[in-house]
């Protein structure tokens, strides 16, 4: 369809049937042949179809051809012998390409004006020097030349000029002035730039120097925008949603295990918890439905700290028993007033209160099977009872004492009720570990840098 607003050929449903001449010459060889005047076998297919101008039957000719250094196209030409109406257009015979294409041609000579151009329906044509643009889908596709594109634009602008001159003389005068500029381009009054931008990737501008490089032509391939994909009738690909990172802080994980008491199948719950003003820890709790045994354990969620930690709390008030406490597996506990020390790994890791830990210590000591029964040492039993009583007094707030947590790994914690201010009754010390402490933590022989060089076995 031309720029003058000509009507396109009849719809496929309006076709009557192929002419006898077309039926008598069956196609041989490739379906799409290179466009050549010397190829006698390359004959168009003729179809009788409805003229949309006079509504009588005209003839549509279809030519399946291949543009050199480009791709296959279908050239369609319609003519009506009754009213004289004719129209020519092209359609791409291939699929929409993966990328859009933009041709930028600097026209300097008549040779450039004669370059072959394939312009599809979806292509936008621009001449920046004149601030002129032919929008996409405003014209049907065409197989023409650069000069033909300009002539087509001139015809479209001249179409309604007589009416404009009678109704809007000022606008018609400005359009006449612009038409004059387009005609000057045809006469090569000055060089200009022609830009053909096709999101479908199926437009083409000839390179007369092919396969050598064309210095006057710049070809740019680009990814279509969602708006361009929608314009072409393609389903715009939704942007890939970033997979949400699994937030374990708000989820309790469960896995099967065996009860440490009766060895029956049990379930262990595990949850990641953020301790305020400290770090993340992993709390695991096991509940056996068979024997009723319950246990919980805390694992550090981080690495071994560069320095060890010693926390000293002076217990002066019963409210101290409510302080949250994290005791890691590597933490030892001391109560100097009771001459008591609980070694590393005893009771395992725990996240509880100070009262809860002291009760666990009392239960651990008083229920020791070697201190009970007839065979127990009376002096030892008496000392344990005295220890239990004094520990009970500390729990009840009747006895002041110092509670010391010493963790070489630096992964234990005791709540500061005055946070973020300093606690006057609590002292936190950071210290450098000794060789023996590093040995217990397995750090002395650990190589964290340059370990790749020592992987090969030495012989």
UniProtKB/Swiss-Prot annotation:
Subcellular location: Nucleus; Cytoplasm; Nucleus, Nucleolus; Cytoplasm, Perinuclear region
Pfam family, one: jr-ZPR1
GO molecular function annotations of the record: protein folding chaperone; receptor tyrosine kinase binding; translation initiation factor binding; zinc ion binding
Chain positions covered by the region annotation Disordered: 1-43, 439-459
Deletion phenotype: Die during early embryonic development. Embryos show growth delay, failed to form normal trophectoderm and to expand the inner cell mass.
Keyword Repeat: yes
Keyword Cell membrane among record annotations: no
Gene3D superfamilies: ZPR1, A/B domain, ZPR1, zinc finger domain
GO cellular component: axon; Cajal body; cytoplasm; Gemini of Cajal bodies; growth cone; neuronal cell body; nucleolus; nucleoplasm
Zn-finger (C4-type) residues: 51-83, 259-291
Tissue: Expressed in brain. Expressed in the spinal cord motor neurons (at protein level). Expressed in spleen, liver, muscle, kidney and testis. Expressed in the frontal cortex, cornus ammonis, dentate gyrus of the hippocampus and in Purkinje cells of the cerebellum.
Induction: Up-regulated by high fat diet.
Biased composition (Low complexity): 9-30
GO biological process: apoptotic process involved in development; axon development; Cajal body organization; cellular response to epidermal growth factor stimulus; DNA endoreduplication; DNA replication; inner cell mass cell proliferation; microtubule cytoskeleton organization
Disease entry from the Swiss-Prot or TrEMBL record: May contribute to the severity of spinal muscular atrophy by increasing spinal motor neurons degeneration.
Function: Acts as a signaling molecule that communicates proliferative growth signals from the cytoplasm to the nucleus. It is involved in the positive regulation of cell cycle progression. Plays a role for the localization and accumulation of the survival motor neuron protein SMN1 in sub-nuclear bodies, including gems and Cajal bodies. Induces neuron differentiation and stimulates axonal growth and formation of growth cone in spinal cord motor neurons. Plays a role in the splicing of cellular pre-mRNAs. May be involved in H(2)O(2)-induced neuronal cell death.
Subunit structure: Component of an import snRNP complex composed of KPNB1, SNUPN, SMN1 and ZNF259. Interacts (via C-terminal region) with SMN1 (via C-terminal region); the interaction occurs after treatment with serum. Interacts with elongation factor 1-alpha EEF1A1; the interaction occurs in a epidermal growth factor (EGF)-dependent manner. Interacts (via zinc fingers) with EGFR (via C-terminal cytoplasmic kinase domain); the interaction is negatively regulated in response to epidermal growth factor (EGF) stimulation and EGFR kinase activity. May also bind to the PDGFR receptor.
Family classification: Belongs to the ZPR1 family.
Descriptive protein name: Zinc finger protein ZPR1
Organism: Mus musculus (Mouse)
Organism lineage string: Eukaryota, Metazoa, Chordata, Craniata, Vertebrata
Gene this chain is encoded by: Zpr1
């Amino acid at each position: 369809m031309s720029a003058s607003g000509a009507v396109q050929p009849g719809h496929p449903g309006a076709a009557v049937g192929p002419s006898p001449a077309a039926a008598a010459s069956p196609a041989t060889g490739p379906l799409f042949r290179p466009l050549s005047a010397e190829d006698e076998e390359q004959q168009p297919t003729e179809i009788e179809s409805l003229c949309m101008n006079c509504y009588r039957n005209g003839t549509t000719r279809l030519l399946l051809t291949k543009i050199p250094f480009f791709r296959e196209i279908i050239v369609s030409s319609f003519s009506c012998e009754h009213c004289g109406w004719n129209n020519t257009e092209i359609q791409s015979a291939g699929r929409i390409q993966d990328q859009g294409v933009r041709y930028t041609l600097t026209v300097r000579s008549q040779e450039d004006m004669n370059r072959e151009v394939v312009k599809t329906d979806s292509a936008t044509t621009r001449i920046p020097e004149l601030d002129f643009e032919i929008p996409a889908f405003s014209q049907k596709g065409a197989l023409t030349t650069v000069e033909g594109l300009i002539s087509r634009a001139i015809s479209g602008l001249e179409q309604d000029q007589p009416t404009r001159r009678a109704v809007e003389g000022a606008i018609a005068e400005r359009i006449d002035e612009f038409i004059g500029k387009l005609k000057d381009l045809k006469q090569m009054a000055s060089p200009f730039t022609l830009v053909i931008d096709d999101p479908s990737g199926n437009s083409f501008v000839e390179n007369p120097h092919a396969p050598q490089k064309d210095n006057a032509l710049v070809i740019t391939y680009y990814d279509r925008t969602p708006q361009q994909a929608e314009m072409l009738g393609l389903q715009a690909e939704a942007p890939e949603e970033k997979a949400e990172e699994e937030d374990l802080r708000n989820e309790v994980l469960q896995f099967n295990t065996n009860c440490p008491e009766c060895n029956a199948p049990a379930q262990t719950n595990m949850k990641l918890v953020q301790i305020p003003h400290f770090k993340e820890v992993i709390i695991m709790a096991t509940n056996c439905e068979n024997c009723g045994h319950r246990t919980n354990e805390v694992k550090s969620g981080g690495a071994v700290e560069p320095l060890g930690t010693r926390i000293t709390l002076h217990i002066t008030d019963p409210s101290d028993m409510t302080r949250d406490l994290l005791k890691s597996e590597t933490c030892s506990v001391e109560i100097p007033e009771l001459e008591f020390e609980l070694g590393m790994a005893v009771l395992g890791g725990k996240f509880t209160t100070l009262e809860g830990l002291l009760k666990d210590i009392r239960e651990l000591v008083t229920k020791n099977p070697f201190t009970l029964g007839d065979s127990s040492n009376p002096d030892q039993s008496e000392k344990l009872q005295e220890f239990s009583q004094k520990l009970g007094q500390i729990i009840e707030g009747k006895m002041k004492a110092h509670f010391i947590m010493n963790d070489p790994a630096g992964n234990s914690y005791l709540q500061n009720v005055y946070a973020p201010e300093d606690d006057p009754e609590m002292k936190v010390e950071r210290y450098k570990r000794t060789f023996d402490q590093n040995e217990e933590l397995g750090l002395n022989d650990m190589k964290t840098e340059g370990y790749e060089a020592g992987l090969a076995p030495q012989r």
